[in-house]
From Swiss-Prot:
HAMAP family with a match to the protein in the record: ATP_synth_gamma_bact
Principal location listed in the UniProt entry: membrane
Description of how the protein assembles with itself and partners: F-type ATPases have 2 components, CF(1) - the catalytic core - and CF(0) - the membrane proton channel. CF(1) has five subunits: alpha(3), beta(3), gamma(1), delta(1), epsilon(1). CF(0) has three main subunits: a, b and c.
Transmembrane spans: none
GO CC term (a single one): plasma membrane
NCBIfam families per record: ATPsyn_F1gamma, PRK05621.1-2
Record-linked InterPro entries: ATP_synth_F1_ATPase_gsu, ATP_synth_F1_gsu, ATP_synth_F1_gsu_CS
Signal sequence extent: none
Name of the protein described by the UniProt record: ATP synthase gamma chain
Length: 302
């Protein structure tokens, strides 16, 4: 019994050490998600204004821009998959990877070749394990992306979108990311990034919001040509921010669950340790009483 008691105490110390780690990770995620949510909210006004400017420029332009022109035959589709660099975030990465697999199957059923572009080490590990070819990948910033990260990705995608099929070009670009709804809910989503579908008309203003009037210098064509790459980068940046907030929320929730489970396990092991200690004490008392009885019996015979 003494050996069993030592084993229980050793397990309790181990679980307590793990609990300290999960609790610390929970607090770190909770503090960082506040900034991540603020970044998502801060990027919305710029994205809305840029959407309106692009829509207005497109409606006043005669430019047949390649980023807004539907191709007659789509041979190759790019899929930008936004995952995480680290684990311990529950089903966050597996959910977005599953959505990516669903999109890939749909595009292949339409006869399109897939060109994967990956964000995050989890997506890279997923593709490497299955020995799948990847066009490009980025990592190291999934929980705190910057606009420069989005611009790097956007520039590569726009460059490949402008290439011919024989040179490795793509005809469509889709983005798979996790949309942040709330601290409890995060949803994997798919958007078609290119060709742009949002420039068919000017976005309607909100209640009480004035519709801006645009004057284009030197021309609507020149403004549209300058705005479209920025618009692509802005949408990618928003997707990365949404994914970062979702990752941190999922990690906080997973670490809180792990901490709660550690508390329950410590209670269970403590109860078992107390039972083992009580059994040891009972056994020792029995041995003492037995020894005293034996001594008393031998003394009475003498």
């Amino acid at each position: 019994m003494a050996g069993q008691l030592r084993a229980y105490r050793r397990q309790i110390r181990s679980v307590q050490a793990t609990k300290k780690i999960t609790r610390a990770m929970e607090l770190i995620a909770a503090s960082r998600i506040i900034k991540a949510q603020a970044n998502v909210r801060a990027s919305t006004p710029y994205a809305r204004a840029l959407t309106r400017a692009v829509s207005a420029a497109a409606s006043n332009s005669s430019l047949d821009h390649p980023l807004i022109t539907e191709k007659t035959e789509v041979k190759r589709a790019a899929v930008l998959l936004c995952s995480s660099d680290r684990g311990l975030a529950g089903a966050y990465s597996s959910s977005v990877l599953r959505e990516g697999e669903r999109l890939t199957a749909t595009l292949r059923a339409e006869g399109k070749e897939i060109a994967p572009y990956l964000v995050g080490r989890k997506a890279a590990a997923f593709y490497n394990f299955r020995r799948r070819a990847v066009v490009d990948q980025w990592a190291g910033f999934t929980d705190s992306p910057s606009y420069e990260d989005a611009k790097t990705i956007g520039d590569r995608l726009v460059a490949d979108f402008g290439k011919e099929f024989a040179d490795g070009g793509v005809d469509e670009i889709h983005v798979v990311y996790t949309h942040f709804v709330s601290m409890v809910t995060q949803e994997p989503r798919v958007i078609r990034l290119l060709p742009l579908e949002v420039v068919e008309g000017v976005e309607a203003p909100s209640d009480g919001e004035l519709q801006p009037l645009y004057e284009f210098e030197p021309s609507a064509d020149a403004v549209l040509d300058a705005l479209l790459p920025q618009y692509v980068n802005s949408r990618i940046y928003n997707c990365l921010l949404q994914a970062a907030a979702s990752e941190l929320a999922a990690r906080q929730r997973a670490m809180k669950s792990a901490t709660d489970n550690a508390d329950e396990l410590i209670k269970k092991l403590t109860r078992l340790a107390n039972n083992a200690r009580q059994a040891d004490i009972t056994q020792e008392i029995s041995e003492i009483v037995g020894g005293a009885d034996a001594l008393a019996s031998s003394g009475s015979r003498a």
